[in-house]
Every structure is written in structure tokens, then in C-alpha cells.
């Protein structure tokens, strides 16, 4: 078992054990073990433990188990204990986020303004920047003047994307953010598709030690046909397909037919203009085709 740190969390990685049904993760303190996570998928090789305190060391161990015919569990021995200290991200890395959504208030509402530290009344139709399209409960949003507010999601109606591809995050901020995510790729490469910046970021290395080597501007899915978010991988590569050079990175997803990295098809890159795929310039796409192996992890966010 190996361990690496992030902000208020640690990531654990291990080699898959054949013939088992799952794993149990224990936090170790004062000589005692406390079960913190049970993993029932035997093919899983990593997990993240959150809710920790930055700057405070935490220790963990694990064991595998096998289910008998009568559902009883037979356990392996415990692994050796590993420790890591979560650390807060820098301001620049903390500022990295996914695509925002333009929204308006549905009615006249009272919200809490974090900047002013008091309640505030917003008129119906007030423009707000929201972090999500599907909103439940209370969320933190921004007014167009940059002030942060707390508002009930049901009081908002989203109507479009807010993105910014004119500028980009720094290399160091990208590496710090990605290395806090405990992302494990089957290859020595990792791809992060930044939907807010309309960028395909290519890293080389291994979990906890990813180094940015390329950043390509891209087109992303539109508000009505969004690019899937989450962790995927490169499933296939085609040189002369329906859309020319393609790398398939999603089976199914929001649009049901899978998504690829492919040619721009006569349109510019750097803004939402696809049906969920990532459109790239031909030279950038060919670099991906020639260098990125099948199985490479794709983090779309």
C-alpha cells in the first residue's frame, strides 16, 4: 500500500489481490484501528479518505477479504501502517474550478452576502454565477460584481455556460491541483480536460507525481449537449474514422453515443461548440494520437 496527500484528504493505492472480494481501510491512532472505508469491488486499486485536518499526520492500514459460500468473511493480515499529512492547496491551485453556469433569480429572494456579512435582497431576474446546472439545497454563488452569496438552488434558473479560454492557469497550479486528486492512470500519461479554460492538459509521471508536458486549446460540449464530467480513459484510437483522427475517451456518457477527441470540423477551438466531444486543432490531435496510449486516464472537469 502506498499513500499520498492532498488538501484535507489522503489517497491510498495498492496492488490488486487475486481471488478476493474486497478490501477494508482502517485509520490507525493510539495503537487502535478504526474501519473508515469498505470497498466491495475487487478490481479497485485506489481510494481517497477525506474529512482530515490539514497539517495533522494521519495513519492507515488495510486488509483484503474473501466471501465464503455462507457469506462469512475470511480476512488477510493487515498491511503495514502508512502515514501522510494533508496540506492545504495554494491560493492559485484552490482557484481552479470547472465550468460555471449563468443563472438568474426566479423571484425576489433574500440571500446571505458573505462579502458584506449580512442578508441582502435580490430582485427577480438578478444575474448570478452558479457552480452547477442542477442545483439542490443551499449553494454558494457569485454576483456579477464578484461578491459571494448563499442562495437556495430552487430560486435560480440556469441558462448558459460561463467559461474563459483567453487565459489559463499556471503550470505549477495545474500540477499542484492534479497531484492532490490521487489520480491513477494505467499508463505513464494522464489527461485533464479543463472545461472552464477549454484546455486539454497532458501530464506525464505517476500518481502524486504528475508533471505537465502539454496544454492544448479545445472546443467543449455546449450547454444543451455538455461534455461528460468525471474520470474516464482512452478506449480506442482511429486514424481515418467518421470524424478523421479520433481518440475515444467516453463510452456512453450524457449523450449516449460516446465522446472523442477529434478534429474541429471547420470551427474554431476555445469555446463550447460540440455535442460533448473535445474538438482540437489537427497538429495537437496528431500529437495526442502518436503519443497517448490506450488506457490513459482522462479527467474531465
Which residues are covered by each model-predicted region?
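Pro/Thr/Ser/Gly-rich low-complexity, intrinsically disordered linker/stalk tracts
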Residues: 1-19, 54, 71-89
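Exported/periplasmic cell-wall-interacting domains
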Residues: 92-100, 104, 162, 167-168, ...
Amino acid at each position: 500500500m502506498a499513500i499520498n496527500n492532498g488538501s484535507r484528504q489522503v489517497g491510498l493505492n495498492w496492488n490488486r489481490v487475486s481471488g478476493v472480494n474486497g478490501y477494508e481501510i482502517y485509520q490507525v491512532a493510539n495503537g487502535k484501528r478504526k474501519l473508515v472505508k469498505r470497498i466491495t469491488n475487487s478490481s479497485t486499486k485506489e481510494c481517497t479518505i477525506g474529512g482530515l485536518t490539514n497539517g495533522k499526520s494521519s495513519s492507515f492500514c488495510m486488509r483484503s477479504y474473501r466471501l465464503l459460500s455462507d457469506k462469512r468473511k475470511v480476512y488477510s493480515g493487515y498491511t503495514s501502517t502508512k502515514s501522510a499529512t494533508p496540506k492545504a492547496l495554494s491560493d492559485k491551485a484552490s482557484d481552479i474550478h470547472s465550468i460555471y453556469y449563468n443563472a438568474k433569480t426566479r423571484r425576489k429572494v433574500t440571500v446571505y452576502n458573505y462579502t458584506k456579512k449580512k442578508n441582502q435582497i435580490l430582485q427577480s431576474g438578478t444575474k448570478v454565477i452558479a457552480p452547477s446546472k442542477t442545483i439542490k439545497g443551499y449553494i454558494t454563488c457569485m454576483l456579477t460584481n464578484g461578491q459571494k452569496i448563499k442562495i437556495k438552488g430552487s430560486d435560480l434558473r440556469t441558462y448558459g455556460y460561463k467559461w474563459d479560454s483567453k487565459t489559463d492557469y499556471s503550470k505549477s497550479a495545474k500540477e499542484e491541483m492534479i497531484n492532490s486528486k490521487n489520480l491513477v492512470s494505467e499508463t505513464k500519461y494522464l489527461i485533464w480536460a479543463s472545461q472552464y479554460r477549454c484546455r486539454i492538459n497532458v501530464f506525464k509521471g505517476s500518481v502524486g507525481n504528475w508533471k505537465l508536458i502539454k496544454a492544448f486549446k479545445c472546443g467543449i460540449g455546449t450547454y444543451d449537449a455538455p461534455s461528460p464530467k468525471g474520470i474516464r480513459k482512452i478506449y480506442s484510437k482511429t486514424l481515418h474514422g467518421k470524424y478523421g483522427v479520433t481518440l475515444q475517451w467516453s463510452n456512453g456518457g450524457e449523450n449516449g453515443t460516446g465522446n472523442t477527441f477529434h478534429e474541429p470540423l471547420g470551427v474554431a477551438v476555445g469555446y463550447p461548440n460540440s455535442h460533448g466531444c473535445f474538438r482540437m486543432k489537427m497538429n495537437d490531435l496528431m500529437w495526442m494520437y502518436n503519443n497517448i496510449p490506450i488506457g490513459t486516464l482522462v479527467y474531465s472537469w
